[in-house]
């Protein structure tokens, strides 16, 4: 119901925009979506959801990993295209395998199989850069320390559960522009923060 209310709000109040993909979007500025996790899990009921994939992706985020081999080994395909695109760019194969062509799809499946089976290949080609896992569990501070935001949240929930400062940020502002403009990793996290 809350998700459907959000969609209705966007349709009724949203502004149509053209953005970088030229697909077009309708959006509203800052809609706060609140969910009481004591009562239910916020899973969409309006379409089929690959719940195993959702669970594996969340566990992957929480480990701090940015190499998607674990996801590929567990049948989660949502991140495959990002690594494959990096591979094509760095090996000058973009023209040989035009995006979404039949050849591209066949070669990407071969690429994923190699990732699953070859440790060295996986280490070289399947790191997405400083996305969710790194930002959540190994945020790089100015002084070089790594900050584990998930551990901080867990500690605060045990010791100061009424604090307004219990939140996780997925956007390290020192890296955002680099993530946006560089093509050698995934783009910035979609979910910028949660509280």
PLM regions with names:
Residues 1-195:
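Terminal, non-catalytic protein-protein interaction segments that mediate quaternary/complex assembly
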């Amino acid at each position: 119901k809350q998700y459907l209310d959000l969609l209705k709000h966007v349709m009724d109040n949203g502004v149509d925009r053209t953005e970088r993909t030229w697909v077009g979007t309708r959006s509203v500025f800052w809609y706060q979506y609140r969910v009481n996790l004591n009562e239910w899990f916020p899973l969409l009921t309006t379409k089929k959801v690959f719940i195993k994939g959702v669970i594996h992706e969340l566990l992957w985020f929480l480990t701090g990993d940015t190499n998607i081999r674990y996801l590929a080994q567990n049948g989660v395909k949502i991140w495959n295209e990002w690594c494959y695109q990096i591979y094509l760019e760095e090996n000058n194969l973009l023209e040989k395998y035009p995006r979404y062509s039949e050849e591209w799809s066949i070669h990407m499946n071969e690429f994923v199989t190699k990732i699953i089976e070859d440790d060295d290949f996986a280490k070289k080609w399947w790191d997405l850069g400083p996305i969710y896992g790194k930002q959540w569990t190994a945020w790089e501070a100015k002084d070089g320390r790594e900050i584990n935001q998930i551990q901080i949240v867990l500690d605060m929930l045990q010791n100061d559960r009424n604090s307004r400062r219990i939140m996780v940020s997925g956007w390290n502002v020192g890296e955002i522009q680099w993530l946006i403009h560089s093509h050698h990793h995934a783009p910035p996290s979609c979910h910028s923060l949660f509280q």
